[in-house]
């Protein structure tokens, strides 16, 4: 058992200690099945992120793995790629079970598995509360190789024998801290008892409270531990600048001037409100700039279309609220402009991380009025980073 193991002594830190530091910095050298590799690149990944470089290989090799990482680090793709590599598409039975704390996250994971596994002929079913039990039963009888779901519904389906566990090789717990804090502990323990003894366990968690550590000691064998720290993740390779703007009204002219100076391959401009997004889109369009806009008032179909145009490069500048900042990988973004500084520090990393995400370089420019200076200092402190005044030669950096 892992309890005597050194990393778990640091419990009060709430942080595990890595015991594994091998990295693989290209998807090509991971020995992935050709049809999986094709799916990885088709999905838009170019280089593995910090967690993907460390965690994919030990999972593929069959180790139990604990990975401590925040959201927005590419962790969903980490276990999706590993699961797809290990399962046998010809066996029409559930081989991997993935648990998530919320229905939304479970559906998001399902989309990623389906997208990356696009060329592999595998089925992935989302087993979540709030949907028809009958539909679940029917889908599970077809034997999807991957089932992703919330603990309550998954537990129910296993107990009713619709979700069969005999062929399960892998059990993934995503956002384990969230699941346990939401009171799913009992169901999770029950599910563990119902899986084959030899099942490989992969646990991902942003924090490592006592209850998560207990799960790791009880149910994991000699786990590989991987800690991906916040700063290492997202601000690496990203140059951050600010432009002092005397008052709010002058931001628009500042943005127009910036357009003149810089050739933008692709940029995202963040505003704090939907109204501001629409206003800025109108103003820039009136000045003959081509921009597209996206926020939460739009329906999913509209948003998908806008993202598709942006991904393909037919639209070059996207103006958005924080809705976009989480979980969307746009590989070619070279520039992120915070027209408004985010209202909370956590969103800063989600916005900026876009620019240099997954090993790409990027530039972030923050428009800062006198009212924003305190927030900017807080952001610098929180991420132990520096945001410097934008130099004249900024065009050379993008």
Curated annotation (Swiss-Prot):
GO cellular component terms, A-Z: cytoplasm
Alphabetical list of InterPro entries matching this protein: DEAD/DEAH_box_helicase_dom (IPR011545), EIF4A_DEADc (IPR044728), Helicase_ATP-bd (IPR014001), Helicase_C-like (IPR001650), P-loop_NTPase (IPR027417), RNA-helicase_DEAD-box_CS (IPR000629), RNA_helicase_DEAD_Q_motif (IPR014014)
Domain Helicase C-terminal: 237-398
Domain Helicase ATP-binding: 56-226
Pfam families in the cross-refs: DEAD, Helicase_C
Gene Ontology molecular function: ATP binding; ATP hydrolysis activity; RNA binding; RNA helicase activity; translation initiation factor activity
Enzyme class: hydrolase
Protein keywords: ATP-binding, Cytoplasm, Helicase, Hydrolase, Initiation factor, Nucleotide-binding, Protein biosynthesis, RNA-binding
Record GO biological process: cytoplasmic translational initiation
Intervals of motif DEAD box: 174-177
Q motif, short sequence motif: residues: 25-53
Residues where ATP binds: 69-76
Reaction(s) catalysed (UniProt annotation): ATP + H2O = ADP + phosphate + H(+)
Localisation: Cytoplasm
Top-level taxon of the source organism: Eukaryota
The enzyme's E.C. designation: 3.6.4.13
Assembly, per entry: Component of the eIF4F complex, which composition varies with external and internal environmental conditions. It is composed of at least eIF4A, eIF4E and eIF4G.
Family classification: Belongs to the DEAD box helicase family. eIF4A subfamily.
Known function: ATP-dependent RNA helicase which is a subunit of the eIF4F complex involved in cap recognition and is required for mRNA binding to ribosome. In the current model of translation initiation, eIF4A unwinds RNA secondary structures in the 5'-UTR of mRNAs which is necessary to allow efficient binding of the small ribosomal subunit, and subsequent scanning for the initiator codon.
Domain remark from Swiss-Prot or TrEMBL: The Q motif is unique to and characteristic of the DEAD box family of RNA helicases and controls ATP binding and hydrolysis.
Name of protein: ATP-dependent RNA helicase eIF4A
């Amino acid at each position: 058992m892992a309890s005597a193991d050194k990393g778990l002594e640091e419990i009060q830190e709430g942080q595990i200690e890595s015991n594994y530091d091998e990295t693989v910095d290209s998807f090509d050298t991971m020995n992935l099945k050709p049809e999986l590799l094709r799916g990885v690149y088709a999905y838009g990944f170019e280089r593995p992120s910090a967690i993907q470089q460390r965690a994919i290989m030990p999972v593929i090799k069959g180790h139990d793995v604990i990975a401590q990482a925040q959201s927005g680090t590419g962790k969903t793709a980490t276990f999706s790629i590993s699961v797809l590599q290990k399962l046998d598409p010809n066996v029409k039975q559930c081989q991997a079970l993935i648990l998530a704390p919320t229905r939304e996250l479970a559906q998001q994971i399902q989309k990623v598995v389906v997208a990356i596994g696009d060329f592999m002929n595998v089925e992935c079913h989302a087993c979540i509360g709030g949907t028809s039990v009958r539909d679940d039963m029917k889908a599970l009888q077809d034997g999807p190789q991957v089932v992703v779901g919330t603990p309550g519904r998954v537990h129910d389906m296993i107990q009713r024998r619709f979700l069969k566990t005999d062929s399960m090789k892998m059990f993934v717990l995503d956002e384990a801290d969230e699941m346990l804090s939401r009171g799913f502990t009992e169901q999770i323990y029950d599910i563990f008892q119902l899986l084959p003894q030899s099942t490989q366990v992969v646990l991902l968690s942003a924090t490592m409270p006592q209850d998560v550590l207990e799960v790791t000691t009880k149910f994991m064998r000699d786990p590989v531990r991987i800690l991906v720290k916040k700063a290492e993740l997202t601000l690496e390779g990203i140059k951050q600048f600010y432009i002092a703007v005397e008052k709010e009204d002058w931001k628009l002219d500042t943005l127009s001037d910036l357009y003149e100076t810089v050739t933008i391959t692709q940029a995202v401009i963040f505003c704090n409100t939907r109204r501001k997004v629409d206003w800025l889109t109108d103003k820039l369009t009136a000045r003959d700039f081509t921009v597209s806009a996206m926020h939460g008032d739009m329906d999913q179909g509209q948003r998908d279309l806008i993202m598709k145009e942006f991904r393909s490069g037919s639209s070059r500048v996207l103006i958005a609220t924080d809705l976009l900042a989480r979980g969307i990988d746009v590989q070619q973004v070279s520039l992120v402009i915070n027209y408004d500084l985010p209202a909370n520090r956590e969103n800063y990393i989600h916005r900026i991380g876009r620019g240099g995400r997954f090993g790409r370089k990027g530039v972030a420019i923050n428009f800062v009025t006198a009212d924003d200076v305190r927030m900017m200092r807080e952001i610098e402190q929180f991420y132990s980073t520096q945001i410097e005044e934008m130099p004249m030669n900024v065009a050379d950096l993008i």
